[in-house]
């Protein structure tokens, strides 16, 4: 068995990780995580979501990483680089997902460390994200020194259909040069 390796997914390597990303989304949603999909998510929908990422990756507006072990995707994270002329200093952290069976191994922290380092290289000194209020993810982001701004009530539905608030976080990495 190989050790888990962090890899950047490019337009060229996308096909190699497509199935693993779809499986990760499927298992994450069916594990109860609120990442934009409902409990009736099937693999066809998961593949469609994956396929929608490729154009943004090719355009350079979305950066995507996976942690893979023996070519199995265990975790992933995305960084959406704001393309607005007045927002070139910021980016949104999206879809940090870790397989339920791979949690507790530090993969989320490994991904977030990489996301932050690359954000600085892209001169994105302000990162923001949202996560389900009251979820275990809140403690995770707080431990990484993200600042909680507040909540939006009834912002999204959990996979089982209940409306739930989302918590908004940010982190300042430094001033772009």
Curated annotation (Swiss-Prot):
Q: Tell me which domain of life the UniProt entry assigns to the organism this sequence originates from.
A: Bacteria
DNA repair as UniProt keyword: no
Q: Which residues form a coiled coil?
A: none
InterPro entries cross-referenced by the UniProt entry: Acyl_CoA_acyltransferase (IPR016181), Bact_Acetyltransf (IPR050832), GNAT_dom (IPR000182)
Per the database record, which ranges form the N-acetyltransferase domain?
A: 4-174
Q: What is an example of a Pfam family matching this protein?
A: Acetyltransf_1
Name the Enzyme Commission number(s) assigned to this protein: 2.3.1.-
| Alphabetic keyword roster | Acyltransferase, Transferase
Residues that, per the record, bind acetyl-CoA: 27, 96-98, 104-109, 130-131, 141
Q: What enzyme category does the UniProt record give?
A: transferase
Which molecular function GO terms apply here?
A: acyltransferase activity, transferring groups other than amino-acyl groups
What more the UniProt record tells us is:
Tabtoxin causes wildfire disease of tobacco.
Give the protein's function: Renders tabtoxin-producing pathogens tolerant to their own phytotoxins.
Query: Protein name, please?
Result: Acetyltransferase
Source taxonomy: Bacteria, Pseudomonadati, Pseudomonadota, Gammaproteobacteria, Pseudomonadales
Query: Gene behind this chain?
Result: ttr
